[in-house]
Amino acid sequence: MRRILLSMIVLIFLASPILAKNIVYVAQIKGQITSYTYDQFDRYITIAEQDNAEAIIIELDTPGGRADAMMNIVQRIQQSKIPVIIYVYPPGASAASAGTYIALGSHLIAMAPGTSIGACRPILGYSQNGSIIEAPPKITNYFIAYIKSLAQESGRNATIAEEFITKDLSLTPEEALKYGVIEVVARDINELLKKSNGMKTKIPVNGRYVTLNFTNVEVRYLAPSFKDKLISYITDPNVAYLLLTLGIWALIIGFLTPGWHVPETVGAIMIILAIIGFGYFGYNSAGILLIIVAMLFFIAEALTPTFGLFTVAGLITFIIGGILLFGGGEEYLVRKEVFSQLRILIITVGAILAAFFAFGMAAVIRAHKKKARTGKEEMIGLIGTVVEELNPEGMIKVRGELWKARSKFNGKIEKGEKVRVVDMDGLTLIVVRERKEGGEK
């Protein structure tokens, strides 16, 4: 009996390595490559390292992003103690520009059918006339040397890697596999694990070669947090620009309709989110400054109508500010289409604002013509709201228009109180506090 028990114990110990599962982590990176993307890579790789995983697979879909963030990510991948597999997924995804460098810096590259890789020419953003600023030869040559070294280190086709920059070359999965740029074409994670099982890859941090063992594997997914999703969304330059624009207009609406507070609150939140997005993606502070100046022009037009002078100045400043927003000299590794789409958005928003103010100015002109015909008789008796304390002079809003006003009895009338127009002195309304019983103390 004792021999039987001992035999069973020995069999259990011998079987335990066979029963043990190889852990593979899967994480998703989607959107612009920013400094926050590096934080995601670092967090995901660290989790996999701590669990002594067989590998970590990063599902990548990106149009590119900042060069400095990309290089930090590549460095983190090459310092990893376990294999990092870049999987361009799902179908329709791309590892463009900065994404290509990240893929070439990984230990194994896989692509799903219908994806693409390549087009890595560095650009510097937008010029004042709206054209894309190409990187000077010195910077371009640096990135050519960098991408070739990444390809050579991993035994991939350095000539094609160079053409990703010099010819803005893009490849399908089948072409990339044929030219020795990637190792696997797979429809899903299961097919990727099956095809890459037994492949050898070099771990630069210790110089050793590792044979991937994806038999008896346990796949663990690292779901993106709410913060990951939010940052990924607002670092899209189109989204960040819209948030900034809508936020500014919400502040203007709140400024012109005091006492409600909702537009100011929503606008402030939008602007904060836009600033966070710009902070991760990179921006030109001159562009932000011009957009703020444009906002001041619009507010000035609303408070002291100049029949279009401040509006035109605001629109021109607003569009130039938007164009310069991404022309701060940072090296961007993104598809040119990203900046082209942004330019279209800036022009479209500018056109909408122009149309809005054209109709707005027409309404103001009609209102002023009407006032000129009717005189003060039409104003007397109207009820308004104090928007700037009368002590004895201030501002009130009557029929949705801002007017300079003066208390008839030189008393103080608080902001938010109702007043009645009793006379006019030039363009200044003479008012009294509106009370149920009438009169003013």
Swiss-Prot record:
Secretion signal span: 1-20
Recorded consequence of changing residue 62 to A: Reduces enzyme activity by over 90%
A cellular-component GO term for this protein: membrane
Any Gene Ontology biological process: proteolysis
Domain of life of the organism encoding this protein: Archaea
Active site: 97, 138
Gene3D superfamilies for the chain: 2-enoyl-CoA Hydratase, Chain A, domain 1, Nucleic acid-binding proteins
Subcellular location: Membrane
Regulation of protein activity: Inhibited by divalent metal cations, including Mg(2+), Mn(2+), Ca(2+) and Zn(2+). Mildly inhibited by 0.01 % SDS and 0.1% dodecyl-beta-D-maltoside. Activity is nearly abolished by 1 % SDS.
Temperature dependence as stated in the record: Optimum temperature is above 90 degrees Celsius.
Annotated phenotype, changing residue 138 to A: Reduces enzyme activity by 99%
Keywords from the named record: Hydrolase, Membrane, Protease, Serine protease, Signal, Transmembrane, Transmembrane helix
CDD domains assigned: Clp_protease_NfeD (cd07015)
KW Mitochondrion (keyword) present: no
EC number from the UniProt entry: 3.4.21.-
Functional pH dependence: Optimum pH is 5-6.
Family statement: Belongs to the peptidase S14 family.
Protein's job: Protease that cleaves its substrates preferentially near hydrophobic or aromatic amino acid residues. Can degrade casein and the stomatin homolog PH1511 (in vitro).
Subunit comment: Homodimer.
Protein name according to UniProt: Membrane-bound protease PH1510
Biological source species: Pyrococcus horikoshii (strain ATCC 700860 / DSM 12428 / JCM 9974 / NBRC 100139 / OT-3)
